[in-house]
Amino acid sequence: DLGHHVAAFGGQPYPVLDPRVRLTQLPSLDIFNDLYPGRMPAFWELKSLSDLIEVTQYSAGTFSEPLAFSHRAYRALKARTAEFDLVHDNQCLGYGVLAINKILPTVVTLHHPITVDRRLEMAAAPNWHKRISIARWYGFVKMQGRVARRIRRIVVVSENSIDDISRDMGVDRSRMRLVHVG
């Protein structure tokens, strides 16, 4: 209504959006669906490099969605760059976001670094075996830090987030802008 149009790219479960927002569905292998969480896709379901990324990362014990989704989003956006002036990444921070940033101006919102979640889970882990599993699962966090350090525009939602992101991800404070939620 203010002269701009918003489009969203999303994977399962697909978001319910305002009717004025056009959704481009980026189907995944849906490994984390509610009915069959952790299902292993059959080989004939692997139809793209994104699918291969998703299943191999998951098979290695890593949360695969950020990398696989960012790759799918890049492939979808690459064919439609003329339609967009700006891309807003909401904390995916997969390597595909760096590729998107090369073809379209990109801003990232970081609510808080997942390093905080990882640190809390590691502290609560009862034994070394569980800590190894947690470290593997959060393997994507290193990628998110690398991507965040290379993105020029980062929106954060609190002063605590600025402190955590700067400390844990090595992002220069001068590239973060505080925008309160609400």
Set out the residue ranges of the language-model regions:
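Active-site proximal beta-strand in glycosyltransferases
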Residues: L86-H88, N101-P126, M176
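A short, histidine- and acid-enriched strand-loop-helix "catalytic/donor-clamping" loop
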Residues: G94-G96, H112-R136, R150-R153
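Membrane-proximal helix-turn-helix segments that form the acceptor-binding/catalytic region
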Residues: Y74-K78, R131-I154
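A conserved catalytic-core segment of Leloir-type glycosyltransferases
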Residues: F9-Y74
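Short beta-strand->alpha-helix junction loop in the catalytic core
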Residues: I114, S161, H180-G182
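A short, active-site helix/loop in glycosyltransferases that binds the activated sugar's phosphate group
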Residues: V97-I100, V141-R175
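Short N-terminal targeting/anchoring amphipathic segment
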Residues: A76-G94, V107
